């Protein structure tokens, strides 16, 4: 089984270089990782994409990802319109209820990141759970949220993650377990992240499935200029 950590930030804004992150991820047993940038401009996204392409190798896959931080729904849709066709994985930073809702209502989003952040609830309700399932939007279990929290805050985060796993089991939306790492020292091995998933209510098989390549190949096919729709491409001949 090929396993991927789909939410990692190298320097900048992370603390470790992309090369160091990749080297450490290899040693931990990953098949590939997604390196994320914040799409503050087209220049940043293009530069990030080139860096990722240069880092790919036959024995280790590196995936282009962006993490959108939007204050309004309009800002979110503008970023999606601008950058969805330039990257392989789109992550939307959650927390705000309106952003959470907008993110799961479009199939242009791959992952909603820590929807429970800074909230008194899990960030996902039953209506949003159905939308996430319909649009194949993964709800993230971000290990860094646990790693960098303490006492009551950590207890609340874990409880909210458990609630989202219950919703995932009931409504069938996908889950993405990620390290959320900003440093190579925040990376964890596939088995460790799978164990984290089990600790918040996932079955072991489902936890490992959440680490698989899944959407990557589908999205790479969509980025092909000849792609029209699933199963349909335009032949150059």
State where each predicted segment sits.
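Charged catalytic cores and adjacent phosphate/nucleic-acid-binding surfaces used
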Residues: 1-35, 40-58, 74-81, 85-86, ...
């Amino acid at each position: 089984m090929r396993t991927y950590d789909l939410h990692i930030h190298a320097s900048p804004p992370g603390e470790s270089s992309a090369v160091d992150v990749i080297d450490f991820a290899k040693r931990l047993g990953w098949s590939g990782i997604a390196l994320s940038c914040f799409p503050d401009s087209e220049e940043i996204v293009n530069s990030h994409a080139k860096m990722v392409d240069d880092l790919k190798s036959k024995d280790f896959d590196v995936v282009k990802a962006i993490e959108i931080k939007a204050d309004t729904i309009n800002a979110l849709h503008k970023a999606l319109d601008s950058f969805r066709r330039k990257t392989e994985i789109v992550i939307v930073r959650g927390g705000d209820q309106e952003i959470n809702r907008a993110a799961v209502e479009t199939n242009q989003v791959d992952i909603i990141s820590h929807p429970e952040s800074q909230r008194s609830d899990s960030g996902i309700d039953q209506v949003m759970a159905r939308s996430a399932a319909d649009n194949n939007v993964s709800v993230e279990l971000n290990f860094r949220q646990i790693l960098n929290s303490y006492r009551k805050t950590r207890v609340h985060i874990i409880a909210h993650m458990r609630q989202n796993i219950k919703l995932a089991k009931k409504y069938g939306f996908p889950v993405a377990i990620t390290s959320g790492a900003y440093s190579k020292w925040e990376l964890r091995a596939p088995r460790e992240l799978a164990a984290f998933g089990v600790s918040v209510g996932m079955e072991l098989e489902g936890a490992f499935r959440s680490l698989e390549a899944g959407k990557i190949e589908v999205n790479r096919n969509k980025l092909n200029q000849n792609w029209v729709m699933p199963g349909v491409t335009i032949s150059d001949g």
